[in-house]
Amino acid sequence: MSSHIESSLRIKGLLDSRIGGRPDNQDSAGSADTSLGTIVVVCDGMGGCDGGAVASNIAVTTVIDDVSSAVVGESPAEVLKEAIIHANEMIYKKASETSSLNGMGTTLVAVLITKECVYASYVGDSRIYQLRGKKKVFRTFDHSYVYQALVSKGVITEEQARLSSQSNSILKALGVEKTIDPEVYALPYLKGDRLVLCTDGFWGSMPEHDLITSVCHRFDPENALEQTFTKIENIGIVEGGHHDNYSAAIIDLNTESLIRTKMDKRTKILVAILSFCLLTSLVVNVHQCTHEDQPTQESSSNQADTTKQIQQRLQKSQVL
């Protein structure tokens, strides 16, 4: 069942989770409007029996509760990081206390949207995209074997990784180890940017280019999400109907962050060229002005010399 993302900020968003072709849904997702900003979390659980569902639910609930209890003045980045660390501890503790939940864990993607920027963090192979139209401004890099060991070294392409039989071999997850040290990224944003948080059942269903086209700005978040879910379901049915759970949140940012976005390489080059042209034009104009002034000065000097010569001749004539 889809859920609108409530926020006091100028954003519009929707999140949803579907069972796919599996007997149960181990994904979880949630959001809340807090004093620090809007928190959105999407998780993909794993583990026998109900372990995956339990782990993903603990992660979503813990992170949202911890961020919601924070007060204005606390560092959003630190609050988000500590909330994820706490979620890891809670899942690990629960798995240790209940034998049937041994080995459970979950991936996580979370964003804390503030006026200053978007604070983003992830664990595992669920993803965060920041899109500007169809341009990919930011994307998390999966904590998985195929990405960390193969794609990062140029051994295989991202599309080959998506189709690999080892694509589900993840290197990090909440609840698997006793401690975890998540990274938090500060993402400046422009008005019109779109955030997509999703599990691998969502992004792994089709080539990335097709996915970005499907969730791009031609549609509002609700239509974009529904259209993409329909595509994923149809692809899953064609491929045998045993496709994974898939969950996602799509959020439109309808204002600009207080922290300014950095210029990309292409923009920097363009600015440099324009600056050079402007400077060159200025130098040429100054040179021309200086050159035009010189004949005037020379002419004045010649006129002065002529006047002096006339005066001298007059003096001579008077003497004679």
Describe each PLM feature range:
Residues M1-L320:
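PP2C/PPM-type serine/threonine phosphatase catalytic domain
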